[in-house]
Amino acid sequence: SRVFADVDAYLHKGKATIWGNAYYVNGRTHNVCYNETTDFEQLYPYLMADSVGGKTSQEYYYFMGGFSYPLGKKWTIGAEGEYTARMEYRTRDPRPKNLTGDLCAKVGVSYLLSGLHSIGAAVTARKYKQTNELKLYNEVSVPTIYHLTGLGNDYYRFRGVNTSTYYKGYGVGGMLTYSQKDQKGWFAQAEYEYTNIDKIISTLNELPMATLESTRFHVTVGYLMNDGHQYYGANLDGDIYRKFGTENIF
């Protein structure tokens, strides 16, 4: 169940084009089991887990803004920034309180070839952090907390009551694009991203338990048509995504 609000903006100011987007989501996720960490898909397998789980509440904030500016008749420069914040919690044991911050910036340039063909390139940088804390107030029964390492395994030495962790990391990437100025005909995009995120157990003197490295390569090829009233098109997408994990030995 979710409630959300969404606002978009797009305008021309002189030669510049400015755009932005902001939205807010408030919702709940039911029947969560063996995961007490936010951003599951990004941080798997290095999650904090227990066998109880339950329903979690969440709030999600997103802000994005960018601009582009022509330099003569051939060149155009642009930049875009976005920030995502998320809070996830539960009001009964076990009680996670997760706060995430994800900041991303992108800078790019495009060049108009002969005719209507345009090529572009961009670089991206990213900063990520999550505090992942779990509280247990039941004095009669306390579940075992696991620090998962994938394939049904966990780091046995840290199993128990180490319930305060955080994740921090960075990402870098690049993008190449091809399109036509009138937004008709063929278009293509190739994108690469590398991320490096550390999992740190706060309750063990900031112990660096593991490092997760991931690479993603994405390609899109498509074709657009315009009959004067609306656009029609089709595209083909492909993704190659790999993760590499390193668990430190203590």
Indicate residue ranges for each PLM-predicted region.
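Outer-membrane beta-barrel channels and translocator barrels
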Residues: 12-16, 72-74, 112-116, 181-183, ...
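Surface-exposed extracellular loop regions of Gram-negative outer-membrane beta-barrel proteins
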Residues: 68-92, 102-106, 187-202, 235-239
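Surface-exposed loop/turn segments flanking beta-strands in extracellular/periplasmic regions
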Residues: 32-49, 139-157
